[in-house]
Amino acid sequence: AQTGLGRAEKIRRFWFGGEEMNRVLIMREKDFTEVKAFYWKLIEQMQGGSYLPGWEKGVYPSDIFLRESLRNRALYMLKCDGNYAAAMVLNHETNEGYSGTAWKVDADKHQVLIVHALGVLPAFQGKGVAKHMVKEVIRIAGERHQRAIRLDVLNGNVPALKLYESMGFEHRRTTQMFYEDTGWTDYLLYELVL
């Protein structure tokens, strides 16, 4: 089904605290400007917060990463009462730092869904939005018959660590990894076996 804006496909709807959170959307290439604006707004708004993800405009998520994710229909966004509240990318690509990890499931690349760039605008934080997004990841992975979901969390991102652990993700390893926005730093690698 098309949204009123005709921009993306509706996937799921749910209610939270009397407000309708709906329209987890698979974004399309024509949505690039809107997607980029969302991430830039997120980066700006997180600058004054207690946790800084290290993301930088134009560096992470980069235009190339966003365009590729849109082209592959791997970028999802959640609308709450008509406003974009959260975004994420789901694919099979990992940082080199994932190799050498003692994963619980021995699976090839295309049997594991990887979560990237999951972010929630500060106005929607603490309202169950991130939890809903992770539930969507689990649902999508199940529909695609994936064997596991994996992700990395920047050391110090306590809210994310608590969220993933509360949803059954298990810490597999802490390792130094390089990303353009953070340089070499510690990341915690997590896995949810499906």
Language-model features and meaning:
Residues N22, N83-A87, L113:
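Glycine-rich phosphate/pyrophosphate-binding loop shared by adenosine-nucleotide-utilizing enzymes
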Residues R23-A37:
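A short beta-loop-alpha structural element at the N-terminal edge
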Residues E44-I64:
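Conserved GNAT-fold acetyl-CoA-binding loop/helix
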Residues R67-M77, E93-G97, I114:
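A short helix-loop-beta-strand connector motif used in the catalytic cores of GNAT acetyltransferases and
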Residues A74-M88:
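Conserved beta-hairpin
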Residues V89-A117, Q125, Y179-D181:
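Conserved acyl-donor/pantetheine-binding loop and adjacent beta-alpha core of acyl/acetyltransferases
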Residues G126-R139, S166:
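Conserved acetyl-CoA-binding loop-helix of GNAT-fold acetyltransferases
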Residues R147, L154-V158, E165-M167, M177-L194:
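C-terminal "cap" of GNAT-fold acetyltransferases
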